[in-house]
Design a protein with these regions (language model features):
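Single conserved hydrophobic/aromatic residue that forms the stacking wall/gate
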Residues: 253-263
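Conserved, well-structured core segments that form or line functional sites
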Residues: 79-80, 88-90, 94-225
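Extended, compositionally biased flexible segments
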Residues: 31-129, 255
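Residue-level "contact hotspot" at macromolecular interaction interfaces
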Residues: 37, 98, 148, 240-241
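Intrinsically disordered, low-complexity, positively charged segments
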Residues: 2-79, 185-223
């Protein structure tokens, strides 16, 4: 029981809710970038909330099914089609659909968003690493030997013992209008002009953004503290400011190890 990867898409990996209990050992959290859509994905296909899903960024994967009676779902703001009995249908996010042997699903792209999710009833036959199905690419930890899903991979499936029940929900991925910021321990290390500029200026997300951090381009933040800065650990959501003065929002691959940049 498997599905074949015809096209891997961009940054396609297995993810779950992450490794929340190993941060003190220097192991990053990992996990799905959009936890809400992860949970919805598993709920719609009848899987446990801690089961793995496939996460993709921008362009999604294309799969060919190698067994009958698979119940699937795609979540996020995503365009996709599926080929069933040689006919192509436009897919609808947050609505399950069934596929049979040699049918295909083509997840074309996300729309005005970064990440999308795919799963099947019964889940994927993969092993946990450190009590999680999450993939951490930089350290090669997780299913698939810690690697991205690639062309010609055969993704093994668990046998689905539950009856297939078609489900759908009306769900809108709302646009965030405001981001709340709390002053950190290093806030007073920046000039008054930089503090004011940070809250009043616009910043552009750059193409250097990845699962470790969201890199921003905009007004430079000037650090006025000349002596060495005490190193502190990092967590998701911390805004780190390297020597070039361009902020980085720490995300799920953030290393808990101390850094010398201001926050």
């Amino acid at each position: 029981m498997s599905i074949e990867v015809i096209r891997p898409g961009i940054n396609t990996t297995f993810q779950d809710r992450g490794r929340s209990n190993l941060y003190h050992l220097g192991i990053p959290f990992s996990g799905a970038m959009d936890t809400r859509n992860l949970l919805i994905t598993n709920k719609l296909v009848g899987n446990d909330k801690n089961d793995a899903v496939i996460e993709f960024a921008l362009q999604g994967p294309k799969f060919k099914v190698k067994q009958n009676n698979i119940n699937c779902v795609v979540t996020g703001n995503v365009s996709f089609t599926f080929k069933k009995n040689s006919k192509i249908y436009n897919g609808e996010c947050y609505k399950t659909f069934d596929l049979n042997n040699n049918d295909e699903i083509d997840i074309i792209s996300t729309n005005n968003s970064m990440y999308g999710y795919f799963s099947i009833s019964g889940g994927f036959k993969i092993e946990k690493k450190w009590n999680s199905y999450s993939t951490h690419l930089r350290s090669k930890v997780g299913p698939n030997k810690g690697n991205k899903i690639v062309e010609n991979d055969l993704l093994q499936l668990n046998k689905n013992l539950k009856p297939i029940i078609k489900k759908s929900i009306d769900y809108s991925n709302s646009k965030i209008e405001f981001i709340r910021v709390i002053k950190g321990t290093n806030f007073d290390y920046f000039s008054k002009e930089s503090q004011k500029s940070f809250f009043e200026s616009q910043y552009q997300v750059t193409n250097l953004t990845d699962r470790m951090g969201m890199r921003l381009d905009g007004n430079k933040l000037n650090n006025i503290k000349s002596e060495n800065i005490k190193s502190e650990g990092l967590i998701k959501g911390v805004i780190q400011v390297p020597p070039d003065g361009k902020p980085i929002i720490c995300l799920l691959y953030t290393s808990p190890s101390p850094r010398d940049e201001t926050k």
